[in-house]
Amino acid sequence: RLAHISGFGVGMFLSAVAIWICSMFELQWNYQWFVIAILCLVLTIPIISSPLEKGSEASIDHASQSNKLSLGFVGISVGYFFFGFGYIIFGTFIAALAVNTPALESIQHASWILVGISAMPAIFIWQAISKLTSNHISLALSCFTCSAGILILYFFDGIAASLFACAAYGMGVVGIVGLVLMEGKIRHSGSIKFAVAFLTTTFSIGQIVGPYISGLMIDFFGDYQNAMLLSGCSLFMAGICMINYKLLFSRL
């Protein structure tokens, strides 16, 4: 269910609060990791203790299906790569940016708490937008929301810009995660398992490459600004790629 994706925001909120509390007690990073591990174990208890609904067990389809890639599916796959590339840069370095910027140091923990709070209701908002427009438009708007927040942080300094960027990031990321696999299944006529695996692979490649390239940029330029610009532009490109142009032009 799409509603379960709101747990994405709950997890970010709880982890941010836990790290904040650990920092108050001046716990070192290795103890903070231990605290988060314990928190994750506790949160798995409701999952493993809840009985499966009848008929909810996963089935394996052994029928051979053609997995020829359509242009629309390639487009959303490229978009998901750009999303993974751009979103991980901001997610990786926003806390470091706050810590190393005197004007933002006071919000280093509040930034991720705000991301989590914004992410909790986001899937319901994007689902409503999807019903008013269409799934691919809602997906593109999610990407543009993330991009706008990060680019505002690039062009404007200060706490207000940072908090807006975090709120837009939390709001947009959940919409993308919640809708992209659904849209991928729509655009791919073959195996659903193949569609999910292919999209996840392109997303993962973006997550691997993004921090490496942005890390090199941070070392070269000596600040985080250009890495944030790269993140915002990547998410904008993700939005462009997510649009189903064949469907869009057929309705004009």
Name each region found by the language model:
Residues G72-P121:
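Extracytoplasmic gate region of multi-pass secondary transporters
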Residues G11-S23, A95, W126, V209-I218:
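Small-residue (Gly/Pro/Ala) motifs that create kinks and tight helix-helix packing interfaces
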Residues S134-V180:
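C-terminal transmembrane helical hairpin of 12-TM major facilitator-type secondary transporters
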Residues A122-S134, I218-D219:
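Helix-to-loop junctions at the C-terminal end of transmembrane segments
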Residues L43-P51, L229-L252:
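Multi-pass alpha-helical transporter architecture, strongest
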Residues S23-I38, L216-L235:
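A membrane-interface helix-boundary motif in multi-pass transporters
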Residues A3-L52:
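Helix-loop-helix hairpin linking two adjacent transmembrane segments in secondary transporters
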Residues R187-D223, S231:
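A late C-terminal transmembrane helix in Major Facilitator Superfamily
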